[in-house]
Structure formats: structure tokens, C-alpha cells
């Protein structure tokens, strides 16, 4: 509850991987679990049964739109992913970037001052470090 209260005050937040997923309404990993409900949507397993899960390795993000932290300089850059579940049923207006891995999924989400990234910027070399730097300097 302290995190939800903090986020409801439009405080600055950068959720990484599961830290992004907890922003959703519901998660369906082992059992149905209520999320924080900050960004509407659900966390579900990849739909494509032919994919190797977890999605692990480098993949490209594609910006829908940029803002002060997630700028055009990140478009078409590779970041490091390790996950089996993705944000689904999310409003397009809450998605800053998407990635393709058997299907299109949100890789960066935003609502107010709250950001979530499905990838691991701390493992993503210079692009990841630049994203973290932008977040620290501009949030």
C-alpha cells in the first residue's frame, strides 16, 4: 500500500520488468493477482506457443511517441529483455514504445510521472544507462 499511495500522488517512478508489471490492474502468472491499478491493463503470458519463453536477450524498441525522458534517440535501439509475461489490454495512449517478439507488446509505458520498462536498462549498455540518466535528470 505505501507504493500505491506514493504513485497516486503522481510521484516520479521508474518500474523495471516486474516493477512495470505491478502497475497493471491484474496479473495472471501462477494465480490471478491484483496489481496496483495505476495503468489499466493485464499481465499475461506471451500468446504465441512457438516462442522460446522466457524472451531473453537483445531486442529493439520502437517508439510510438517521445517525451522528455524517452526521446527519439532511443527509437530502434536494442535493449536487454528477460521476461515471460507482457502488458496486454492497455490503452494505446499509455504506451510509449513497443517491441516485437512473436507479437507486438508494450516495452515502455507511461502515465503522468510514472514510467515502466519491460527490459532491463541496467543491463542494456549505453542506451540503458542513457535512459536511466534521462530519468534521474528530468524526473
Residue ranges and their predicted role:
Residues 1-57:
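Cysteine-nucleophile active-site neighborhood
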Residues 5-8, 41-139:
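Amide-donor transfer/coupling interface in amidating biosynthetic enzymes
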Amino acid at each position: 500500500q505505501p507504493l500505491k499511495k506514493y504513485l497516486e500522488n503522481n510521484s516520479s517512478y521508474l518500474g523495471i520488468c516486474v516493477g512495470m508489471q505491478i502497475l497493471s490492474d491484474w496479473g495472471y502468472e501462477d494465480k490471478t493477482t491484483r496489481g496496483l491499478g495505476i495503468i489499466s491493463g493485464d499481465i499475461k503470458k506471451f500468446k504465441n506457443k512457438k516462442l522460446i519463453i522466457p524472451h531473453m536477450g537483445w531486442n529493439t524498441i520502437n517508439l510510438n511517441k517521445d517525451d522528455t525522458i524517452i526521446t527519439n534517440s532511443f527509437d530502434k535501439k536494442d535493449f536487454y529483455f528477460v521476461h515471460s509475461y507482457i502488458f496486454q489490454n492497455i490503452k494505446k495512449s499509455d504506451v510509449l514504445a513497443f517491441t516485437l517478439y512473436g507479437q507486438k507488446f508494450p516495452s515502455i509505458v507511461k502515465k503522468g510521472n510514472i514510467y515502466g520498462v519491460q527490459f532491463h536498462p541496467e543491463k542494456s549498455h549505453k542506451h540503458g544507462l542513457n535512459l536511466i540518466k534521462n530519468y534521474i535528470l528530468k524526473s
